[in-house]
Amino acid sequence: MSLIRTRLSQQVTQSPLQTVHHPLLTANKVSLSIKRDDLIHPTISGNKWRKLKYNLLHAEAQGIQQLLSFGGAYSNHIHALAAAAHLFNFKATGIIRGEAHYATNPTLSQAQAWGMQLQFVDRKTYRLKAQQDFLTQLTLEHPNTYIIPEGGTNALAILGVEEVVEELSLQMPQPIDHLFTATGSAGTLSGLISGAIKHSPNTKVHGIAVLKKAEYLKQVIPELVPNAESINWQLHTQFHEGGYGKVSAKLAEFCQQFTTHTQIPIEPIYTGKMLFALWQMIEQGEFAQGTNIVAVHTGGLQGLAGLKEQQKF
């Protein structure tokens, strides 16, 4: 039997669905539940686990022993990949955008503790990460290696994220009107769209872009989900709070107050930014009374240590 499937059954759980109680929701007569993907696994959580699952199974089935991927110095994906490689007995290499001194930060220190080898490259080189010539060279330098794209987004990742909606269709007693996620590379958003097509076609799927100038993702999504237009979905590009990794004072305050009120830990880069956007939409009366909303907690809590180190949060 597959080592990965055996350990999955032992260690990885279906994430719970938690109802949120808040005066804003009561006043506007809307309901909100959070899909707690941050609780899937202690170290490989959230959308990063969803994206990795079928990539890891594919690598195992092919007899491949090493994984390689790309990320920034505080990357949730790199952290999750290192943890997964350690858990499932792969070797792992991370191609890291930035200088070698980042190796001592909380994210990369832990990745190395799990056995990941780091290779630092400058921004110009890093931009080649999707170019075939560059990937071919990496394959020559790292034989018997399975290369996973930055952020983990590919066709196998979409299959993993689809399972969020499949689980929700069994967990929710009533139909979901709106399903929200943060989005960076559009992988999680695309997976939710694909999952909704299969399991919840009347749900509108929303992606809150966490980076500036994210309109290009509207072209990326149909490439990942060719039949995306068969359901209702929307990419919101106006809630980035200054760009990727930017944490405004209002966003930081919201995240802290939300965690205090709900006891649900969130970070301001992805889930916090998404919920802050959702809160503004509710305040503006964008949802009819009786609307049923689900938001996906995509994890990323390991990044809090790095944010504190950078004095951003």
Identify the role of each PLM range:
Residues 1-313:
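PLP-dependent amino-acid enzyme catalytic core
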